[in-house]
């Protein structure tokens, strides 16, 4: 039997995926703490941060999800999407309102002495607020259209610009982070060009995670894995930022308890934009953009699939105004769904891909 056939025959449940991912990430974080000789109840313990974030989000979900259902904060499903998704209509959305605070609070308690941790928390909340505005407009107008794309993009650029201004005030225009580190000991001095790259990274990453948030447990699980991976990477040299990473990873794992297939709640733009904004901001302040590019390769793949789909459709548009599609549907996860993959098969594959990409960073280093 080929690998492809074996994968197609593997049909895990959402519960199995949740427990497997949570156990694997917790074991990896525990191992890193042991390697660095950090006790469980030390403020620098990444396992403590992960556990607190997880516990707060998991507990909060049992209160917030029924509340969202009572106020009729149900998701509107796109009619041109996979038909199997129509049954999800009415599932509460905006779950980021409990996942994000639950992930940030332990970080601020354990590592709040670091100004960088507060800056990361603020930029995460800024993107969560932009997402909340979009979610609220969708619920208010009872359709799948939130704030206008132009306004949304302007707000994303505004938040990125303000964050970069703060960094400039701390480090100057040509601070140490403007020379970005690369694999194999290489580096690249960008000087002033670093700042447009930083703004672009924040905006593009927040949109990439937003595009990835299309299946039960997909964005939450892969996002938690990337955050935990960044925490493991940064623990020796930047313990405060690593604590932030693991705390937020715990928040998304706790959210995943309620978002695993079949989902009781969706994170909405409130969670997905905040997730991407946080991951990008971490990579910027910790000077590990190449690590983000590799660990977050799935988010890049999802974004590229949309760009290629739109570009190909426009390039092949005929006199009737209709073009050809490169994929069955974009993003990539919907293409696989329409090819006969179940949701959990796609999610399991993407979890595996993300974990492999995270592991590959140590090989590249």
Swiss-Prot record:
The keyword Transmembrane helix applies. The lineage of its organism: Bacteria, Bacillati, Cyanobacteriota, Cyanophyceae, Synechococcales. It catalyses: UDP-N-acetyl-alpha-D-muramoyl-L-alanyl-gamma-D-glutamyl-meso-2,6-diaminopimeloyl-D-alanyl-D-alanine + di-trans,octa-cis-undecaprenyl phosphate = di-trans,octa-cis-undecaprenyl diphospho-N-acetyl-alpha-D-muramoyl-L-alanyl-D-glutamyl-meso-2,6-diaminopimeloyl-D-alanyl-D-alanine + UMP. Pathway: Cell wall biogenesis; peptidoglycan biosynthesis. One of its GO terms (cellular component) is plasma membrane. InterPro entries: Glycosyl_transferase_4 (IPR000715), PNAcMuramoyl-5peptid_Trfase (IPR003524), PNAcMuramoyl-5peptid_Trfase_CS (IPR018480). This is Phospho-N-acetylmuramoyl-pentapeptide-transferase. PANTHER family: PHOSPHO-N-ACETYLMURAMOYL-PENTAPEPTIDE-TRANSFERASE, PHOSPHO-N-ACETYLMURAMOYL-PENTAPEPTIDE-TRANSFERASE HOMOLOG. It is an enzyme of class 2 (transferase). It is a multi-pass membrane protein. Belongs to the glycosyltransferase 4 family. MraY subfamily. GO terms for molecular function: metal ion binding; phospho-N-acetylmuramoyl-pentapeptide-transferase activity; UDP-N-acetylmuramoyl-L-alanyl-D-glutamyl-meso-2,6-diaminopimelyl-D-alanyl-D-alanine:undecaprenyl-phosphate transferase activity. Its EC number is 2.7.8.13. Keywords: Cell cycle, Cell division, Cell inner membrane, Cell membrane, Cell shape, Cell wall biogenesis/degradation, Magnesium, Membrane, Metal-binding, Peptidoglycan synthesis, Transferase, Transmembrane, Transmembrane helix. GO terms for biological process: cell division; cell wall organization; peptidoglycan biosynthetic process; regulation of cell shape. NCBIfam families: mraY.
